[in-house]
């Protein structure tokens, strides 16, 4: 891998989307933990993931401005609430509908959505939602193909899986290449993934309604 930079701020050509696309060339799996997710962000990276075997996206469910503001204002009850499965599915449905209706670039969203659905149906991609509304972590984990000199790498920081987070906003993200960092991040992701709710089919149903 030619890019040895550790920090990505979306300035001067070091946007996070470009690094994701570079690392995807070497990856057999890609795991994402993101508080916010929009299909326009997925559009920025999906082409490089064509040869990736497995993609898992774990999202928070506090994905609208109103809820995010409430949490930032210290609404402890809202922050700590654990939702049941029907409530999680309803929130995901609301999020997808809102994006489709309010996106500034509906064509990009549409292209990202079509690929997203295709990969869900093939089993390549699974999206889950964490049932607690206090998850705001951002984590990108690549597991490399066998024979690579490293097992994997991790990027963590401020960027959500959105076009703004990957390209437009001033962000601060760091790549961690140490094996111990990769293993720690992978283990924590697996813990959260196990306790999360599969919303893949709800995503497809909402888009196709």
Task: Please describe what each predicted stretch is.
Residues 1-209:
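PLD/PLD-like phosphodiesterase catalytic module centered on the HKD motif
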């Amino acid at each position: 891998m030619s890019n040895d930079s550790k920090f990505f701020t979306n300035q001067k050509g070091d946007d996070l989307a470009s690094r994701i696309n570079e690392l995807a060339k070497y990856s057999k799996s890609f795991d994402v933990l993101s508080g916010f997710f929009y299909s326009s962000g997925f559009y920025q990276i999906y082409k490089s993931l064509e040869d990736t075997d497995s993609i898992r996206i774990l999202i928070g469910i506090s994905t609208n401005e109103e809820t995010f503001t409430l949490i930032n204002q210290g609404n402890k009850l809202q922050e700590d609430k654990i939702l049941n499965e029907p409530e999680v599915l309803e929130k995901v449905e609301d999020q997808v509908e809102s994006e489709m209706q309010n996106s500034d670039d509906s064509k990009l969203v549409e292209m990202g959505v079509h690929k997203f659905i295709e990969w869900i149906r093939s089993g390549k991609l699974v999206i889950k939602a964490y049932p607690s509304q206090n998850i705001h972590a951002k984590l990108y984990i690549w597991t490399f193909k066998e024979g690579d000199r490293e097992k994997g790498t991790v990027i963590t920081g401020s960027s959500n899986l959105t076009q703004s987070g990957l390209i437009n906003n001033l962000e601060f993200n760091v790549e961690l290449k140490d094996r111990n960092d990769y293993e720690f991040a992978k283990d924590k992701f697996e813990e959260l993934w196990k306790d999360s709710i599969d919303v893949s089919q709800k995503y497809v149903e909402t888009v196709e309604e």
